[in-house]
C-alpha cells in the first residue's frame, strides 16, 4: 500500500525544494460541494498530487476542498486536467494563479481532513451555505467602489488588512474568521439598506460570509469573484485601475504579494513605513510581526531585545527555556496592542 503522508524531515524537504532548478507555480483554489467520504477522497487525491510533485496545504471536509499549492511549471496543465477529471464537481474549477511568485511558497504536501474547510463556528442547522451573494468581476468592483450606496467589507484577519485593503473598506476587527462572522452582522446593521460587498484573499471566506449575511436578513449582498488575487489579475489584464492599496497577505513562505506601490503599514518596532511580515528568529517565540530592514539588523531578526538576547544563548539553554514555557507561535495585533497565539504562518482556514 502506498505511503499517504510525508516521512521526510522539513529541513531536508526545504533544502531539496531550494535546490530545484525547475520553476514552480503557486496556485490556490476552493470549492464548496458535498464530499461523501472526505478521508477516501483525501487518500486518492494525495496520490494524484504526489505523482505530480505538488507541494502545499490542502483541507477536505464534507463541505468541500480548500487548497494552496505549488506545482512544477511543466506539470501545471497536467495537474489542471487531472484535477478537473478527479470529480465532476471540480470540472472547470477556477484556479487562482499567484500574482508574485518566486516558486518557493511550499516544500511539503500536507493534506488533512477537517470538520470544515474554513473554521466558521456556525452551529445553525437552518443555515444554507449555498445561498450566497452575487459575484462581482473586476470592472463591477471598480464601479461599486464609486457607488456611494455600497459598503466594502474586508473578511480577512487584522494582520492581512493592516498591509493592504480596498479603498475605504471596513475592517471587521478579529483574529479569526469565526470571530468575524457575528461581528460583521452586528457592525453592518446600520448599513442594512446598503449594497454589501465582501472580499477576502481568494474568495473562500467571503463566499461563505455572503451566505451568512443573507441568512441574517441582508438582501443586497455581493462578493468578489476569486477574491483579491483574481480581481488584481483581471484588472491588470483589462487595463483597469487597480483599486486595492498595498500588499495582499498570503498564507505561505512569501507572506505577501505586492498589488500597489503604496506602503500603508508600519514597522512594529520603530514605526517606519514597512509592510513586510516576518517571524521572530527566536524559536521560543516565532511572533509574526512587521519589521523593517533597519530593525531586522538591529535586533538580529528578533521581535525584542529579550528575544535577541535569548537567541544568543547556547542552543541547549534555549531548548531548556522553551521547554519551560508555552511555545510562542504568536501574531502581533498592533490594533489592540497585544499578542495572540497563532501559527508562525497563519492557517488560512481560520
UniProtKB/Swiss-Prot annotation:
The active site annotation covers 200 (cysteine persulfide intermediate)
The top EC class, named as a word, is oxidoreductase
Domain (Rhodanese) spans 146-240
Tell me which InterPro entries the record gives.
Rhodanese-like_dom, Rhodanese-like_dom_sf, Rhodanese_C, TrhO, TRHO_N
| One Pfam match | Rhodanese_C
Q: Which SUPFAM superfamilies match?
A: Rhodanese/Cell cycle control phosphatase
Q: Where is this region: Disordered?
A: 319-350
According to its UniProt record, the EC number is: 1.14.-.-
User: What segments bear the compositional bias annotation Basic and acidic residues?
Assistant: 319-328
GO MF annotation list: oxidoreductase activity, acting on paired donors, with incorporation or reduction of molecular oxygen
Q: Report the record's Gene Ontology biological process terms.
A: tRNA modification
Record's superkingdom? Bacteria
Q: Gene3D superfamilies given for it?
A: 3.30.70.100, Rhodanese-like domain
Per the entry, what this protein does is: Catalyzes oxygen-dependent 5-hydroxyuridine (ho5U) modification at position 34 in tRNAs.
Q: Which PANTHER family match?
A: TRNA URIDINE(34) HYDROXYLASE, UPF0176 PROTEIN YCEA
Q: Which HAMAP family match?
A: TrhO
Instruction: Name the family the entry cites.
Output: Belongs to the TrhO family.
The name on file for this protein is tRNA uridine(34) hydroxylase
Amino acid at each position: 500500500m502506498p505511503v499517504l503522508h510525508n516521512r521526510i524531515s522539513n529541513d531536508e524537504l526545504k533544502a531539496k525544494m531550494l535546490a530545484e532548478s525547475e520553476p514552480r507555480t503557486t496556485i490556490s483554489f476552493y470549492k464548496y460541494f458535498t464530499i461523501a467520504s472526505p478521508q477516501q477522497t483525501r487518500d486518492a487525491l494525495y496520490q494524484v498530487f504526489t505523482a505530480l510533485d505538488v507541494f502545499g496545504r490542502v483541507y477536505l471536509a464534507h463541505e468541500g476542498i480548500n487548497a494552496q499549492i505549488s506545482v512544477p511549471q511543466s506539470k501545471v496543465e497536467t495537474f489542471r486536467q487531472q484535477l478537473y477529471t478527479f470529480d465532476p464537481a471540480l470540472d472547470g474549477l477556477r484556479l487562482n494563479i499567484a500574482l508574485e511568485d518566486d516558486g518557493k511558497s511550499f516544500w511539503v504536501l500536507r493534506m488533512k481532513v477537517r470538520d470544515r474547510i474554513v473554521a466558521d463556528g456556525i452551529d445553525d442547522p437552518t443555515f444554507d451555505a449555498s445561498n450566497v451573494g452575487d459575484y462581482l468581476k473586476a470592472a463591477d468592483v471598480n464601479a461599486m467602489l464609486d457607488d456611494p450606496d455600497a459598503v466594502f467589507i474586508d473578511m480577512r484577519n487584522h494582520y492581512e488588512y493592516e498591509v493592504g485593503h480596498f479603498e475605504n473598506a471596513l475592517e471587521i476587527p478579529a483574529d479569526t474568521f469565526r470571530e468575524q462572522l457575528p461581528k460583521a452582522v452586528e457592525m453592518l446593521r446600520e448599513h442594512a439598506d446598503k449594497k454589501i460587498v465582501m472580499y477576502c484573499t481568494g474568495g473562500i471566506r467571503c463566499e461563505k460570509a455572503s451566505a451568512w449575511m443573507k441568512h441574517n436578513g441582508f438582501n443586497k449582498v455581493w462578493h468578489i469573484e476569486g477574491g483579491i488575487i483574481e480581481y488584481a489579475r483581471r484588472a491588470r489584464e483589462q487595463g483597469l485601475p487597480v483599486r486595492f492599496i498595498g500588499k495582499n497577505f498570503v498564507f505561505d513562505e512569501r507572506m505577501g504579494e505586492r498589488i500597489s506601490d503604496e506602503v500603508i503599514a508600519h514597522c512594529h518596532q520603530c514605526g517606519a513605513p514597512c509592510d513586510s511580515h516576518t517571524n521572530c528568529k527566536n524559536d521560543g517565540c516565532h511572533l509574526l510581526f512587521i519589521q523593517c530592514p533597519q530593525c531586522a539588523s538591529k535586533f538580529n531578526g528578533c521581535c525584542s531585545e529579550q528575544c535577541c538576547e535569548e537567541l544568543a544563548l547556547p542552543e541547549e539553554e534555549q531548548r531548556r527555556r522553551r521547554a519551560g514555557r508555552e511555545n510562542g507561535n504568536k501574531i502581533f495585533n498592533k490594533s489592540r496592542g497585544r499578542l495572540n497565539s497563532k501559527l508562525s504562518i497563519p492557517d488560512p482556514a481560520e
